[in-house]
Amino acid sequence: MRKSIFESILILGTGTLALNIAKKLKEVCADSCTKLLCASYLESPFSFFSTWCKTSKIPYTSFHDKTALEDYINNFKDSTLLISAHNYYLFPAPILQKPFLKIINYHNSLLPLHRGLNAQMWSIFEQDSASGITWHCVSSGIDCGEIILQKSISLDSTYTYLKLTQEQLQLGFNAFMEICDSLMQWNLSLKTQEKSSDSVLHKARDLPNNGILDLHWNFEKKSAFLRSMDCGKSHLLPKPKIILKGKKYTILNYTENPKNALGFDFTLGECNG
């Protein structure tokens, strides 16, 4: 593993991806003069990432205010690599214009497809044949920067939001390991993103069909909708809804059943909204 040319490396992220990258870079920085720091935006103070940083004596800061995080990044004055790993903070123009600051970002789609948030949800709902991950440089356009490396995942009817997310995070770390040496030297082969009419910017509030199952869809589309919002026991997305006889219900669970006219058996709950 090559030593880093950077004075500092800041990992800004959440969850297992940020944690695994931090563990790897702790080894890299131990053999160099590079300072490793970690931070999170809107992360639980009791997360595995924050807990590991504290027990490993890696400087860690948790932010819940955009201005405070911007001030923190602005305090860096020497060559710095910022790794945005499963991070929801959008970097403002003054930060992007700093010549000594290099920023890369993990995104959970094959850019330029599905820019923005919950890309895995949209990839499943739109019945893409493949999904994947992209490591890219950060530019002024959201998820529009030059591509460092992409890895694909072939999709089939078994993929749910949760399953795809888990595979993407592991693939994202594997891809990071591939580029780590080049990244430490900032010696990357970059590819400009192709312009695509299919490139849509998804926002956090956006849900397929506003989160309501359309009973007129065919079985495959219904399945894609349900799987795209299936987060298991987590609460990463709101539960999908269904309208039966003019009344809206929350879909708590679903099971394929070809004997049911709807194609599925549902466990339903009262819907308050």
Report residues per predicted region.
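One-carbon transfer enzymes
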Residues: 1-237, 242-249, 253-272
